[in-house]
Swiss-Prot record:
Organism: Tragopan satyra
Cofactor: binding comment: Binds 2 heme b groups non-covalently.
GO cellular component terms, A-Z: mitochondrial inner membrane; respiratory chain complex III
Pfam (any one): Cytochrome_B
Listed transmembrane segments: 34-54, 78-99, 114-134, 179-199, 227-247, 289-309, 321-341, 348-368
InterPro entries with a match to the protein in the record: Cyt_b/b6_C, Cyt_b/b6_C_sf, Cyt_b/b6_N, Cytb/b6-like_sf, Cytochrome_b, Cytochrome_b_C_euk/bac, Cytochrome_b_N_euk/bac, Di-haem_cyt_TM
Topological type in the membrane: Multi-pass membrane protein
Organism phylogeny: Eukaryota, Metazoa, Chordata, Craniata, Vertebrata
Full protein name: Cytochrome b
Gene: MT-CYB
Keyword Cytoplasm: no
Residues holding a ubiquinone: 202
Length: 380
């Protein structure tokens, strides 16, 4: 029999084992589509970002004008920018749904895969943050000032750390230059960590909605899931293109159409929608260091999830009580997102504090308690 180059060539063999002949559970649902969608998001963002970087100038006097120039004078520059800006939103939608899937179906029990995923989330958040500063509008400047200033809450080294990050005594030209360098570098780091993430996943194989071993019923990734992923891609591209072409500024802040001015503070400083849940948790604590710790905990709590798993069943498919709690957590995050966009006044302050408290309570206390209760119910 003639050798198959797809299975014998050192490079093609790796691609074949990851994307073509990969044994995959036969019953994974559409919730398993988001991994490939995230890969497509990353590819799109790197491509559009590269094209934008060719026309961008990382200088405080020219940054705002260079972005305007890209949109006005570069062939399809407006489209590239709109796809890049709104592509970030879709990246976060996909990663939130991907994490939600992992929580619901107990995928976090693959600890290495889960931990590399958390690292990916943190890197993505860092990339989005430094990227938002680059157009050098009002919200870019003040967002950068407020968020970087939080590091000054770190005892003893805080102030030195902030001035080191800024490259001066305030957010200025050196800050913009280094943020551009970081925004260029981080997506390639994300791509590298993604390969690690995939490598760990392929050590164990995919989880499935039943949470039981699927070794007895595997199907090849291609053509079944390759086709399913292409369908998922078209279903994601449709709303992305609709948003980028019909209302590209829907998710942006109007304040960012004004060039950065250190002498005028915007009435409401708030980040992009995908950071609002964490921003609400930060604001709900009246102490600076406490707020920073809560902000960090709101994301790093994901690292604790595998250790808080007390159920005898892996997934929530047959656990109605945990399901109820899960959807309560989703609703809670939506409330946090909404509160984060509101001004700091009554009743939003107390709503934010209650939502922040319940966020940590659900994850740290109620989930393990409910799992233990469900285990007991199984015995009767």
């Amino acid at each position: 029999m003639a050798p198959n180059i797809r299975k014998s060539h050192p490079l093609l063999k790796m691609i074949n084992n990851s994307l073509i002949d990969l044994p995959t559970p036969s019953n994974i649902s559409a919730w398993w589509n988001f991994g490939s969608l995230l890969a497509m998001c990353l590819a799109t963002q790197i491509l559009t970002g590269l094209l934008l970087a060719m026309h961008y100038t990382a200088d405080t006097t020219l940054a705002f004008s260079s972005v305007a120039h890209t949109c006005r004078n570069v062939q399809y520059g407006w489209l590239i920018r709109n796809l890049h800006a709104n592509g970030a939103s879709f990246f976060f939608i996909c990663i939130f749904l991907h994490i939600g899937r992992g929580l619901y179906y107990g995928s976090y029990l693959y600890k290495e895969t889960w931990n590399t995923g958390v690292v990916l989330l943190l890197t993505l958040m860092a990339t989005a943050f430094v990227g938002y500063v680059l157009p050098w509008g009002q919200m870019s400047f003040w967002g950068a000032t407020v968020i970087t200033n939080l590091f000054s809450a770190i005892p003893y080294i805080g102030q030195t750390l902030v001035e080191w990050a800024w490259g001066g005594f305030s957010v200025d030209n050196p800050t913009l230059t280094r943020f551009f360098a970081l925004h260029f570098l981080l997506p390639f780091m994300i791509a590298g960590i993604t390969i690690t993430h995939l490598m760990f996943l392929h050590e164990s194989g995919s989880n499935n909605p039943l949470g039981i071993s699927s070794n007895s019923d595997k199907i090849p990734f291609h053509p079944y899931y390759s086709l399913k992923d292409i369908l998922g891609l078209t279903l994601m591209l449709t709303p992305l293109l609709t948003l980028a072409l019909f209302s590209p500024n829907l998710l942006g802040d109007p304040e960012n159409f004004t060039p950065a001015n250190p002498l005028v503070t915007p009435p409401h400083i708030k980040p992009e929608w995908y950071f609002l849940f964490a921003y609400a948790i930060l604001r709900s604590i009246p102490n600076k260091l406490g707020g920073v710790l809560a902000l960090a905990a709101s994301v790093l709590i994901l690292l604790l999830i595998p250790f808080l798993h007390k159920s005898k069943q892996r997934t929530m498919t047959f656990r109605p009580l945990s399901q109820t709690l899960f959807w309560l957590l989703v609703a809670n995050l939506l409330v946090l997102t909404w509160v984060g966009s509101q001004p700091v006044e009554h009743p939003f302050i107390i709503i934010g504090q209650m939502a922040s408290f319940s966020y940590f309570t659900i994850l740290l206390i109620l989930f393990p308690m409910t799992s233990t209760l469900e285990n007991k119910m199984l015995n009767h």
